[in-house]
Amino acid sequence: MHPVDIIRPRYPAAPSEFAELDSIFHTHVSHSLEKLHHELTRFIRQKNLSDAAKQAAMAVQLELQQQTSQARTHWIEAESSSSFSLFLKCLQIETFIQNAQFSAINQLLKTLPPMHQTDEPEALSYLAQSAVVCGLPSIVMRLVHALPASQENDGLMCATRVLQKTHTPETQLESQFLAVKNWLAQQGITIDCYGLMYSVIDDQLADLLIYVNERNIERLVCINTNLDNYLSDTFSQNLPTGISISVRSTLEIDVS
């Protein structure tokens, strides 16, 4: 068996300006959307709140209400009022995951310009990690020169090279990765997060891992079987032999 490693987007620490908003979002988003809306409303009404934090909170609330076009205006206002625009993009991606707006995540990543330096290394790493698990290695390459030196980012570049060396058109990688996420959402399956498992020594072996809140092993087997059938029925051109997609339980994630 090949030695493997896994890339999963690692969410950055929130800047102090957005710490309370970020805590509210991540505390309540997976437990009670009603409570989250209540807490966001309370937060927005606070006095002495920075304009960027207020605009970001309004954007999050509108995203969760599926009012995407109105939310976009507030995201833009928040970014223009803050020095932490990359962090705000990370928070925006988190809201998209909650709403299963996976194509919106890809579109956001595609708007990232080439970068050669950054004051937000953790946020930039999260965005680059998100790009690789969305099947967008070209976006990672736009950011590579600004990524901080770390073992984690060395792994990110290794995973990116795996996708590149399969010689699969990026549009095909992206479309099939995206189709799987959308198919799962249509089945009523909530995606918690995702990652890319890749071989450390073989540059053409990788597995997109989609983590769902499912404890029943038989149910997971059934989901994966139906997923394989969906892919074979939907796409005339399969992914290369070394590239696979599988659904796993969130319980498998090593939280140590």
Question: Which ranges hold each PLM region?
Answer:
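N-terminal presequence-like segments and adjacent domain-start helices
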Residues: R142-L143, S150-L173
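Catalytic core of pol beta-like nucleotidyltransferases
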Residues: M1-Y11, E20-I24, L239-S256
